[in-house]
Structures are given as C-alpha cells and as structure tokens.
C-alpha cells in the first residue's frame, strides 16, 4: 500500500494568455513603467515607439541613488542625487539601504549588523525596524516601506516628466531570493507611492529579458549573475523563441558592493587608529566622508591598479591620504568574492546541468565590473567569457520595461512569455509529522496544485491544515507559514471524508491556500502575507544545506513513519473489510473471521504500545498480519471468490490529516 498516492490536480498556468486585446489593455491601464528598485541605485524605463527608453533624471543621470534626506530647519525632503550629495554634512538624517530592511524583523542578525554601520538611527517598533530622523524641529519615524515609497515616487516623477502625463502602473523588480514578506512589503511601498504594482518580477529574470529579447537562434541556456549594491542573485534560464523559463534560482539578499566598501572602510579605520591613535567611528561625518571616497576608489580600481584616497580635514582638522591598490582591495574581499560561486554551483545542480551546458553568462549589477569577480566567473566556467552586450546598471530596468509593455499590450514587444519559479518546496503536515509536498522547489509559477486528504480518526469533525516551506521530509525541520481549520465534517469512519487542499502561487509569487470538504462543501482559505513570518534568506540557505547534510537521516525517519502508517492503514482496512457482511465479512467462516480479527487487534495493540518502533519492526508486524490474512483470502479465491479480489485492497488511499 502506498501512503502518498493521489494528486488530483497539478497544472501550470501560463502568466500571459491574452495578447489579443492590446488596445483595450492600454486604454484600461495606461502607460506601465518598469522600475528597478535597487539597494544603492534605482532605474526606470518605458517601452515606447517599439523600443525601451531608459529615462534620465533631472541631473541627466540614467540611474538615481536610492537615498532620502531631510535637511535644514524646515526639514526639506531630498531624494536621489540631491540626497546623496549632502550625506557627509547631514549623515544622521540621510537614509539609504532601505532595501536591506524591507520585510525584515528588527532582531534579525543581518539587521543588527547593518545598524552598526549606518549613520541614521534604527528603532524597534514591534520587532519591525523603523528609521528615526529629524524633520525640521520634529523627530519622525519611517518604515522601510515608506522610505522605499519615497524612492519609487522619485522614479515615478522622472517617468512622468519624460512622458508628459501621469503614470499609475508599474512593474517593479526584486531579488530572486526575496521571500514573501519582502515581496509584499515592496508592493506596499508601491501603493504608498501611488503606484499600482501590476507585477513583481525577479531581477535576474528581468535582465535575461533585456539580454534575450532579440535572440532568435533556438533554445539557449543563460546564467544570469546579478551582483548589485546590496543583493546577489544567480538564475539559470532557458530562452526559446521568446519564452523565458527560469530553471533554478539562488543567491544572498545581503551581499553586494556595500559589503565590499565596508571591508575597505574597516581597514582604513584600523589603519588610521594605528597611525594617529584616534577612532574615526566617533565622528559620523568623518565616517560618511570616508565611505564616499572608498566607493569612488572601488570604482576607480575597476579600470586602474591603484588609486589615492585624499580627504581634507577628515577628523580633528587632520587630512587623510592613503593609497589603495587593486591587490589590497581584492585581498580584503576575497572571501566575499568566492562566496558568489556557491550559488552558481547550486543552480547548476538544481537544474541538473553541467558548466558546459551554459551557452551564455550575463553579468548584471555594478559590482560585476570588479575585475576579480569577472575573473572568478570566467575561471569557474573554464575560461568562458561572459557576454558584454548589456549595461549592467540598466539591464534590470530594461527587462522590467519590456515586461510592462507586454502586460500593457504595447505593440512590438515580441512574443515574450515569462515563466518564473518559487524558491522553496511548499506542503502541509500529515500523520506522523510528515511534510507532504504540494508544490516543489523551482516549480514554474504561476501554478496551482491540489491533493485529496482524509481524516486520521473515526468521527473526526475537523481537520487542521498546517502549511510549511522547506526541503526536509519532516515538518519539525521545516518552517511553518500558517494554519487554519476545516470544520463541520459529518461523522464517518477514518479515511472516508475527502478534504481537497489547493495551493496556488500567483504571478507575484504569493501563496494562497484553500481546503474544502467535498462532502459538505465547507471550506476555508489563507493567504500567506507579510503578517506571516516568512523565512529569511539565511534560513532558506540553512534549510537547503541541512537537507543535503542530513539526507540519510531524513530518509530513515521518513521510512520509519511511512512503514508505521502502512501497517496502521492495513490493519484498519482489514478491520473494516471483515466487519462488512457485503464484502469480506460475508464470505468468511467464523473460524477464519476470528483468526483475522485477533491478528488485527494484536497489530493495533502493538502499534499503541510501540510508538517509536523501527522501520524493520513495523515491516515485520505487517508481514505477521499478512501471514494470517493472505492464506485465508487466497483460500477464498480458490473457492471461486476471485470476483471479490479487489475488495481486500483499497480503491483509493489518501494521506491522513
């Protein structure tokens, strides 16, 4: 008997099925813009006149710093270049890195580490990190969503100035490894900015669209390596005649250019203290002056082998002058550079591909300009040169603009179909604490899967649907997302009621779960939103690593539970059959009936007193029960009862809740 046997519905829906009503879409939604909301810089584009336009801001720059500042006695709000330019004179009231806070909790390790380096104050509000700044004479707190909304407002204004009319709809990109809470928070930021976020898409996927739009030469496997200011993503996609299918994704939502800057900052702060005996950290302005010059030096080292960092009157009126070589920069960050290769290896494993199967390597994000990063990737792929026909700063916004054009029904966007994936396995708890999978890791989304379950006890009037994500076979090793109950189930023997559980992931990667009692029509549902504690990227990585590390233990535990479930189901099934006079019960002699009843009762009693029995012990007990049942059933067949053969076996089996 198989415990996991019935999947009623399993289908993948294409995100785009109506390209016909293009004019109707445009009139209904208006112009849809594409926004790359970055940790350090943001970028906006629009599909117009048959091509993508990356829109320059009021300073003439095609990328805009993701900075917000409040300055002067009136608390004037500055966003973008104006905010970043006054960072060194107003560090406490200049906010950046909101993307490193969005959708996170105050007590997360990464948040606590970042707080040490930021000049602005972070306060704990119900375990949500809020930014506290002076706005004129008042002290105000802003959520990360509000700060991100201010940046999105700036990007909206940049687009409106160029287009000459109001914009209400946008496609916004997020790192591939953003969890549900972070995606929801990004959508909330759009709403705060007055934008309807019609679609959230993954940054490396957007970059692949930018790269692959004009590629018509058959199926290609594309590895997108996206290393930005604060996040890192790797995605492996196939592109074939305008269909973009994400095969696997991995990354670190807390690794990027700012981490490289921080290593150099710490080096110079220690060096300065060693030479002068003074601690730069005591002066916020001095630290931000150093931060600005270190970032400039890092950029310079992408094209030259050494650069000089000179800052007038850095601390206590003293000037600062030091040389930074490319070799020193690489030494300070080599472990971080090498850490980027692990997700590359993981996506290849997940997609079941070899290095030689990758046709193109696409580099995205400003940090991929670092020569050592380029060299490590080239060496990893045995000397294969990454593609260079794409601007790493603009690629994500470019792809988002194409996607916006497709959704808006703009002509000449080409036959683009985007098939993205969810990053973790999703399932529910069944008898014995087993994680029963409904949607597997790296399944193409949007998707919808259903499975029928049943009750674990006689006359059970309610079932609890407990939802988990993770890669381990037992729920205790995975992460709980939420739970709800289906009640009002009419009294019936165990295994009879049919409860259909449906998991649906929408185009934005957000999970909706419903359950319905097929007998009564009673149903309940749950949407996993920002209020449910979704996993941090660290937890995701730990779970996947744990799943690899403890695979043998997991399998043994799973087999133990399954063997117990099989014995229990077989025993109760036989008990039901011999009690039914229309089936087996009506065909047996009294002596045979007593023999089977006694064997069944012994098995049930043994189960009750041996909760932690091994797989072998469970299997041995099942064999003992079968040794009593099978000769009697065989005797019936030979006496002409073959027509009833199927009655001894179950017609359908459902996992029990």
Swiss-Prot record:
Q: Which keywords accompany this UniProt record?
A: ATP-binding, Chaperone, Endoplasmic reticulum, Hydrolase, Nucleotide-binding, Signal, Stress response
Where it sits in the cell: the answer is:
Endoplasmic reticulum lumen
Q: Which reaction does it catalyse?
A: ATP + H2O = ADP + phosphate + H(+)
Region (Nucleotide-binding (NBD)) residue spans = 128-282
When this gene is knocked out, what is seen? Answer: RNAi-mediated knockdown prevents the formation of ER sheet-like structures during mitosis in the 1-cell embryo. ER accumulates in foci throughout mitosis and partially fails to disperse at the end of mitosis.
Q: What induces it?
A: By endoplasmic reticulum stress.
**Ranges of biased composition (kind: Basic and acidic residues):** 616-626
Ranges for region Disordered: 607-657
Top-rank taxon: Eukaryota
Signal sequence segment: 1-17
Concerning SUPFAM superfamilies, the annotation shows: Actin-like ATPase domain, Heat shock protein 70kD (HSP70), C-terminal subdomain, Heat shock protein 70kD (HSP70), peptide-binding domain
Q: What Pfam families does its record include?
A: HSP70 (PF00012)
Q: What is its main location?
A: endoplasmic reticulum
User: Recorded GO terms, molecular function?
Assistant: ATP binding; ATP hydrolysis activity; ATP-dependent protein folding chaperone; heat shock protein binding; protein folding chaperone; RNA polymerase II-specific DNA-binding transcription factor binding
Please state which protein family the record places this protein in: Belongs to the heat shock protein 70 family.
Q: What does this protein do?
A: Endoplasmic reticulum chaperone that plays a key role in protein folding and quality control in the endoplasmic reticulum lumen. Required for ER dynamics during the first embryonic cell divisions. Specifically, controls ER transition into sheet-like structures at the onset of mitosis, possibly by regulating homotypic membrane fusion.
Q: What protein name is recorded for this chain?
A: Endoplasmic reticulum chaperone BiP homolog
Species whose genome carries this gene? Caenorhabditis elegans
């Amino acid at each position: 008997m198989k415990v996991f046997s019935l999947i009623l519905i399993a289908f993948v829906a294409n995100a785009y099925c109506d390209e016909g009503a293009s004019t109707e879409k445009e009139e209904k939604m208006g112009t849809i813009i594409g926004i790359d909301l970055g940790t350090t810089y943001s970028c906006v584009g629009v599909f117009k006149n048959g091509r993508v336009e990356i829109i320059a801001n009021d300073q003439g720059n095609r990328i805009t710093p993701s900075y917000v500042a409040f300055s002067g006695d009136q608390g004037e709000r500055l966003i973008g270049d104006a905010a970043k330019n006054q960072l060194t004179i107003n560090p406490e009231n200049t906010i950046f890195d909101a993307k490193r806070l969005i959708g996170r909790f105050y007590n997360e390790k990464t948040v606590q580490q970042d707080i040490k380096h930021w000049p602005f104050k972070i306060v704990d509000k119900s375990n949500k990190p809020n930014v506290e700044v002076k706005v004129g004479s008042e002290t105000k707190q802003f959520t990360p969503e509000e700060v991100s909304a201010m940046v999105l407002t700036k990007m909206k204004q940049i687009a409106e100035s160029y287009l000459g009319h109001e914009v209400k709809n946008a496609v916004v990109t997020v790192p591939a490894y953003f969890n549900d809470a972070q995606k929801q928070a990004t959508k909330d930021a759009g709403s705060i900015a007055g934008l309807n976020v019609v679609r959230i898409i993954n940054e490396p996927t957007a970059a692949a669209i930018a790269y692959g739009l004009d590629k018509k030469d058959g199926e290609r496997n594309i590895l997108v390596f996206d290393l930005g200011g604060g996040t890192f993503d790797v995605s492996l996609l196939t592109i074939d005649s305008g269909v973009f299918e994400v095969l696997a994704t991995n990354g670190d939502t807390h690794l990027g250019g700012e981490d490289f800057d921080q290593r150099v900052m710490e080096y110079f702060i220690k060096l300065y203290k060693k030479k002068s005996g003074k601690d730069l950290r005591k002066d916020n302005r001095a630290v931000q002056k150093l931060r600005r010059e270190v970032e400039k030096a890092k950029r310079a080292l992408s094209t030259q082998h050494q650069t000089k960092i000179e800052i007038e009157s850095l601390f206590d009126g003293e000037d600062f002058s030091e040389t930074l070589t490319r070799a020193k920069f690489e030494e300070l960050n080599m472990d971080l550079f090498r850490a980027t290769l692990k997700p590359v290896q993981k996506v290849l494993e997940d997609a079941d591909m070899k290095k030689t199967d990758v046709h193109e390597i696409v580099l995205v994000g400003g940090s991929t300009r670092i020569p050592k990063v380029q060299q490590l990737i080239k060496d990893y792929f045995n000397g294969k040169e990454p593609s260079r026909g794409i601007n790493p700063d603009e690629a994500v916004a470019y792809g988002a603009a194409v996607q916006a054009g497709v959704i808006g029904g703009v002509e000449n966007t080409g036959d683009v179909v985007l098939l993205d994936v969810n990053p973790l396995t999703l399932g529910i708890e069944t008898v014995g604490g087993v994680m029963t999978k409904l949607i597997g890791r790296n399944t193409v989304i949007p998707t919808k899967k259903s499975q029928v379950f049943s009750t674990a006890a006689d006359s059970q009037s309610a079932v609890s649907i407990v939802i988990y994500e993770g890669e381990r076979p037992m729920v205790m090793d995975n992460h709980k997302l939420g739970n709800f109950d289906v009640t009002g189930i009419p009294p019936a023997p165990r295994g009879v009621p049919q409860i259909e559980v449906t998991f649906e992931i929408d185009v934005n990667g957000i999970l909706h779960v419903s359950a319905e009692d097929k007998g009564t029509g009673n149903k309940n549902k749950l949407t996993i939103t920002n209020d449910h504690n979704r996993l941090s990227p660290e937890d995701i990585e730990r779970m996947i690593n744990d799943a690899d590390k403890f695979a043998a233990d997991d399998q043994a535990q799973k087999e133990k539970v399954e063997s117990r479930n099989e014995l229990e189901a077989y025993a109760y099934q036989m008990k039901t059959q011999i009690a039914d006079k229309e089936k087996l019960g009506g065909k047996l002699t009294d002596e045979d009936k007593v023999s089977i009843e006694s064997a069944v009762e012994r098995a049930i009693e043994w189960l009750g007193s041996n909760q932690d029995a091994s797989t072998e012990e469970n299997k041995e007990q099942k064999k003992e029960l079968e040794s009593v049942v099978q000769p009697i059933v065989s005797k019936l067949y030979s006496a002409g009862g073959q027509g009833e053969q199927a009655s001894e076996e179950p017609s359908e089996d459902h996992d029990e809740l």
